[in-house]
Amino acid sequence: MKTGLLWFENDKKKTIKNIVFEAAEYYFKKYGVCSDYCQIPLGTLDPRMNGEIQVGEIRVVEHKGISKEHLWIGLDHEVKENKNE
């Protein structure tokens, strides 16, 4: 992921899905683009999920480089601007 936003959340009452939706909403308001990829700390998900879930259109994966209570949300691909506009 080349484009993203680091999100901090320490509310233990929120589910990972709620946190991802909240971060995605903020990301859209800030950048005007829908995120499609999110990295979360290792051990966040139930082991039966094999380290990956889908939250709406967002692919959520565990990653060793993400600190506890954080997530990295953004685009799994580079957005190409239309030079003709």
Residue ranges of predicted features:
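C-terminal edge-of-domain segments
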Residues: 54-85
